[in-house]
């Protein structure tokens, strides 16, 4: 059990992240987090000002993990193959870590989204760099990145809410075929 003396903001955010991984954002509360850390709820205010700030920190933690994961999955690939690996990595992360639907819907309720937006733009930067290397037209690459991210995130949400009945492999194959069509048509 954690003690007040050993608490830090990092410890509080790590425990909150663990709770969200296990039970989702709806399970995250000051009272539950304090119980998990074996402290009084008011003790948490020293480390995180309010539940929204805590949610932001957890979202940023997940986005950092997603960015690192996607980067690791595209190493050694280029062009369309790297884009397909990126899409697969986002979908796999959403299926096994935290659904992007949960993350994005919680983000929608946050009053100050600047840090979250910056992380999402950092995530978007990976396919942007890949596509810019393929295209001499800046506008073309920008539009393709927007379409790609919309396709990936929309597809992840479609799966997350249970509207896709296939296996994960089938989902990845379907997403990849749609991305290939998009990349070929541009």
Describe the function of each predicted region.
Residues 96, 149-167, 181-186:
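Amphipathic C-terminal alpha-helical segment
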Residues 22-25, 45-56:
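HTH DNA-binding helix-turn interface
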Residues 54-62, 104, 112-120:
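Alpha-helical DNA-contacting segments of helix-turn-helix folds
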Residues 1-23, 53:
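Basic, helix-initiating cap at the start of DNA-binding domains
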Residues 91-113, 157-165:
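Amphipathic alpha-helical segments used for helix-helix packing
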Residues 57, 71-97, 145-148:
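Hydrophobic alpha-helical connector segments
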Residues 110-136, 142-146, 173-180:
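Amphipathic alpha-helical packing segments from all-alpha helical-bundle domains
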Residues 32-35, 44:
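Append "Primarily bacterial transcriptional regulators
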